[in-house]
């Protein structure tokens, strides 16, 4: 019955495509879906977004042949919550990927985290199965590493990659090296079977991830619609690239990583064209959060004209590069000023498959097909959360900050700075400043760097405040926060003995189990 419903809805979508002058011919076949998610890549890292060295020819061509979003946002300024939001279509405050351990703290999933994606959340690959999709994740999962959080338990059919970031190397005594999985079992660990040379920056991981993507596309292209989630992490510090790309960028080691990713994406798009499935494959490129300026320039990217970076709810922390490519459907050379969100990829992907989101829960993602296919703009807010705290909201061109904070004085004095060289008096604060009674409001069109707040006495301020306040009140009145998943840590749950370790002789002995509150210092 579900297959019949899916087919019926796909036929309805075909009628929409035909009405837009972009119809398909032959039997109804939902398009393949390919989501390219980068790690800590900034808005200003692509040539098409103004990066002066212009070392991303394939991504720039993807933009020229498709649609570019200059106003596209992650759902959080950190990796894990943003990825959970993409795959659920829901804000982290709704899907549980936040902490209540301290006010306005960011949180993610290091290997000592106890929590992960709850079974109650319905992920995109689970829902796409109803329309016959085969799904694979390549790269970084980051939604929990314990067995109950495994991606194959949440709808994916295949996985090659890791549950955590590639930090290390560790001594396998105080802390284990991070495992790499093929499907259900580990096949090695970072810095062991999958070496990363921290001194030179050399690692072959992006090439491995590229081959995994190419092989999957070749196997599936003629049989079933596929969903490929390509979540590479070469641009997350410590950044890496394979030997042919090392030393090739004007931007140092980070630029080498970007160049290799760009080359890989070019090869993926070329394969789609060679297999004659490009016109039946929707491709979307974006990043999980802003560039980590604390690691720049050698280990971090650029957020263009925007303030601060990863870890913050200023534009540099959550405004992302975003490109849509679907030959024959998305008109080439478009720029859309639609406010977009990473959560929209959930709802849009379901619409492409002829499916609708679950009706028993709040969904924050919009269906962007009217924008992609017909150029329509839709009103919507962007909410900027840090932990369980709504820090800011954007509506139209205006952004209101209810709280401001970069990082604590304690960490700042230790050299941790998420806004290096970007001090804005009264805005980039090292104390958590409460503006809820009189928010700071910026016009992002005139002031994308959030340096000049509107005068409280101006008519523009009063009008913007009224509109944003109304939307925020509606949001907060309807909000039902999920149980926080990122509160408890325990060294005993780290990657000591992942599934498959016995076959490799890689099992390690865990320490005593001592659950405790995670310390989120920022």
Curated annotation (Swiss-Prot):
It is found in: Lysosome. InterPro entries: Alkaline_phosphatase_core_sf (IPR017850), GALNS (IPR035626), Sulfatase (IPR050738), Sulfatase_CS (IPR024607), Sulfatase_N (IPR000917). Changing residue 204 to K: In MPS4A; mild form. It is an enzyme of class 3 (hydrolase). Changing residue 77 to R: In MPS4A; severe form. Changing residue 420 to R: In MPS4A; reduced enzymatic activity. GO terms for molecular function: arylsulfatase activity; metal ion binding; N-acetylgalactosamine-4-sulfatase activity; N-acetylgalactosamine-6-sulfatase activity; sulfuric ester hydrolase activity. Changing residue 259 to Q: In MPS4A; mild form. Changing residue 94 to G: In MPS4A; mild/intermediate form. Disulfide bonds join 308-419, 489-518, 501-507. Changing residue 91 to P: In MPS4A; loss of enzymatic activity. Changing residue 80 to L: In MPS4A; intermediate form. CDD domains: GALNS (cd16157). SUPFAM superfamilies: Alkaline phosphatase-like. Binds 1 Ca(2+) ion per subunit. Pfam families: Sulfatase, Sulfatase_C. Changing residue 450 to V: In MPS4A; severe form. Its main location: other. Changing residue 291 to T: In MPS4A; severe form. The conversion to 3-oxoalanine (also known as C-formylglycine, FGly), of a serine or cysteine residue in prokaryotes and of a cysteine residue in eukaryotes, is critical for catalytic activity. Changing residue 416 to T: In MPS4A; reduced enzymatic activity. Changing residue 96 to V: In MPS4A; severe form. Changing residue 492 to T: In MPS4A; reduced enzymatic activity. Changing residue 125 to L: In MPS4A; severe form. This is N-acetylgalactosamine-6-sulfatase. It comes from Homo sapiens (Human).
